Amino acid sequence: MRVGITGVSGLIGSALADDLRADGHQVVGISRHEVAGGLAWDIEAGKLDPAALEGIDAIVHLAGESIQGRWTAAKKQRILRSRVDSTNLLASTIASLDQPPRVVVSGSAMGYYGDRGDEVLTESAAAGTGFLADVTRAWEEAAAPIADHRVRLCTARTSIVLATEGGALPRMRTITRVGLGGALGSGRQFWSWITLDDEVAALRFLIDNEVEGPVNIATSNAVRQREFAKRLGAALGRPAIVPAPGVAIRTALGEMGRALLLDSTRLEPRVLLEAGFAFESPDLGAAFGLLLDT
């Protein structure tokens, strides 16, 4: 199977590429700079060679500006445009193909739902409000035309991905190891999560199985943030009792801190579960034990 991956150098993209190659599949990395076995695209100029995608079996679209860092007006534009413009380019290129891929898994995120308190959010839940909700809604809308061209389309609403190689966990581990872990704000906000291995397995499941539409990529065991901190502390043998007031987080990190740390998003992966997907690491404490070798 030939699989195209945008964002192939990122945490999820690189892990997915390695996993596919290990099983003998051909990976075509789609990036700004052409690499061996891949191809380059110019999103700003709207250039992607259609011939290079002819006959490809699947595309996993993960490209986008990192949401980490202070959200200045310029940063927010890059977050939005990198996702929407790249997806528009991919959709228009697929529309021109004689042999389009049979499936496209297009990136999205749990930010689609916004800050929802204790509400259990399945894929049928309405979009929320706020910057990330606006971005992910526009991102998914840009991908929608792909389904008009004999292509099965999934939108992967990914949660917090736990990995030792990158993402949020290394920073949280460092903070906890020096004794500064604890509740952020009230600590009552739900954090939805998945390990990197399960994330990769879920994306491959979407490629291989007849699933379409939005898909929550998270375990069904979302936990309150204070419980997340407690379990991380237990895995590291450190207390997690130092709170960070919400006002301090908002002052220090601005809108980004509120959205990523204080918003509550309690995902239920109903589509994955009903399709028969099995998580290897559904328990947070056990996942920390595996990831942190404790």
Question: Where does each model-flagged region fall?
Answer:
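Conserved beta-loop-beta element that borders a ligand/cofactor-binding pocket
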Residues: S108, E141-T164
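Alpha-helical substrate-binding/gating segment
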Residues: R173-G181, Q189-V223
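NAD(P)H-binding glycine-rich loop region in Rossmannoid oxidoreductase-like domains
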Residues: V35-A36, A40-S86
